[in-house]
Amino acid sequence: MNRFFKDVRTIERMKRGPLGCYITFYGDQLLAHGYRRKSCRRKLQLAADFIRWLDRKKILANQVLAKHVGDYLQSRKRSGVGIHLGDRAAVIDFLKLLRERKVTMERIPQPPVTPSQELLKEYDLYLQKERALSPATRINYVPFIGRFLVGRFGRGRVDLSRLRAVDVLKFVRRTAGQLKNKRVLLMTTALRSFLRFARYRGDITLDLAACVPPIASWSLSTLPKSLPPAQVEPVLANVRQRSTAVGRRDHAILSLLARLGLRGGEVGNLVLEDIDWENSRIAIRGKGNRVAHLPMPADVGKAITAYLQNGRPRVPGERRLFLRARAPLTGFKGQGSVGSVVKHALERAKIDSPRKGSHQFRHTLASTMLQKGSSLREIGEVLRHRSPDTTAIYAKVDFLSLRSLALPWPGGVP
């Protein structure tokens, strides 16, 4: 407590009461999660005030309930004491610590689970166990099915045997008008998957998956959205000050994207054990939970080393390679966090790109390899494509080769 408060009387006052001894543990926990001293002081003062309120209400330690958090905050509000953003979370975190220490066994009540949500859990487990789909894929599928079920059954009982082809078509028509083409394709894929799952369980006998209409999609109809190769180096060079922890982190992330063509989610999910320093390799967990071991370029290794030695916070038990810069210091959540790093890097480099996400670095690497003479097969191996058809789109950006195939204009050029 001496790290937060200098006045001995303040510390003694905060430790009074049957729960006062847990204030010190709470302070240690806050520091471990990377909260700054000012934030820690505020949270500790709230916890101590919460303890005093419990004492005044004659609520024993083993009688503390989740509802008491709301009652306490309302009491503060009525007494004219301001409630700041984050106060509720601070008191709840202290209450969680009490539960972890077995001081109180009552858990925060969860909202009732609807039949649709119960079925979604079973479907998600099926995707994980039976189909071996990655969390990223499941996160994309499940919300669409949630909308489908709520739209058909509401919050009441779900009877899949009542589903008909018209229900499927109605949902597709209604939802497709609100989405871009790629999302429509994802939605119909998810819907077919769920309807096969329902038939697999015996909930339906009809093959309703066959009723999901096909969506027109020409995989080679557009060009890959990539940065011009000449703009990649300025993006890396204009990373915010590398003398800061955040700057070193962002430079390491951008180096992985630009040099290895990794997907944003793959970068965000890296853990410390994925780096094989002895053999200069890095393990990448891609689609379908497949693990690939890629050689680690020297500049990428140097960027990661700089971040690990002078940037990455030391958080006990946290194995993610890249951590948030603000408390709580946890690992990145999904590819959106990596995409945010890319977006800000492009803005700092003053590059006006139609795409702001991380995937454009992947396209740029492939286009650069093609221009330097690499075959589509070699590019597919680097990008870890399952099918050659996925790599075939990059043939469209090889303008020199395509120019030689163009037929001359009839009658010559005027």
Regions of interest found by a model, annotated:
Residues M1-P414:
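Conserved catalytic core of the tyrosine transesterase superfamily
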